[in-house]
Amino acid sequence: MLVTMNDVLPQAKKGHYAVGLFNAVTLELAQGIIAAAEETGSPVIFGTAEVLLPYNSLEDLAMILIPMAKRAKVPVVVHLDHGLHKETCLKALKLGFSSIMYDCSTDTYENNCARVKEMADIAHSYGASIEGEIGHVGGAEGAATAEQQDDAAKFYTTPEEAKDFVERTGVDALAIAVGTAHGAYKLPPKLDFDRIHKIANTVSTPLVLHGGSGLTDEDFRKCIEMGISKVNIFTDINIAAVSAALAHFTDMGKGIIDLLPSIRDAIKVSVTEKMQLFGCCGKAGIAAVGMPDEAMIRRIVEEVLRNRRQ
């Protein structure tokens, strides 16, 4: 069932668990993620980031992920993560993505608010949900490793900023900077759990943890306990897939087709472990009903009218 973040994250916030976003930039990743979600009865978020589009275009991913989400026995959000350009976000919405993130966090705070507000209005007109970010999560999305910066705390999100940003933009989910970084860590991360708790008690909008790969199980549990409702994961499942491919190629010495089952199984196992850790197993049944029919009808009508004017 194709849904938006609004159908799964408010319930997660209320129930003190988190829904995982797993980057699904290949068919095998998507199959492993769906298999884990259906087996555990978990809501799940398919993700791809703009920096990952050279590996698979939005058009190709839309043809794979959206039909898979609609056929799934559990709620599935199809989300553009870290959309860096307005044009990319608009393309994702037109292709049928049910959710986007417009990441303007490296811009000035005022520009971040203005740009995300504009995109939030557009996303909501499509019946889609939108995520924004304030502060700065270190490292690069899709990177293999992340450096920990000693002065990173100056980029952390404050409760006051979070409240102001949510009120001014109308985002449906808020990514906050609390000490994580994209990619695997060279040094242990320094997470500010108290900051998460204060922000969660200041805003009603579900909070998102980026840069989750490489954290300990206890780190995840504590973050969710403090108020995180969505966790983004890529490095862990990416490494699991590569490790399985390498191991089975060494054993069998065969071609890519022979490796695919082991790759999908490794992804499924890795995602299942994260879902159990996040506490979302068995929570698929309490999600809302999915993208509203009225919103989908409005999108179709608007698209037809645009085509007639061209």
Where are these regions (language model features)?
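Protein-protein interaction and targeting regions used for scaffolding, dimerization, and localization
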Residues: Q276-Q310
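Alpha/beta enzyme core
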Residues: V3-G15, V25-L52, L58-P75, H82-V203, ...
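Flexible, glycine/charged-enriched surface loops at secondary-structure junctions
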Residues: Y126-E133, G253-R264, G279-D293
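Alpha-helical scaffold segments that flank or form the walls of functional sites
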Residues: G32-A35, D265-M275
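Short, glycine/charged-rich beta-strand-loop motifs at protein surfaces that mediate ligand recognition
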Residues: L207-G211, I228-T235, L260
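Glycine-rich beta-strand-to-loop/alpha-helix junction loops that act as flexible
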Residues: G179, H210-S213
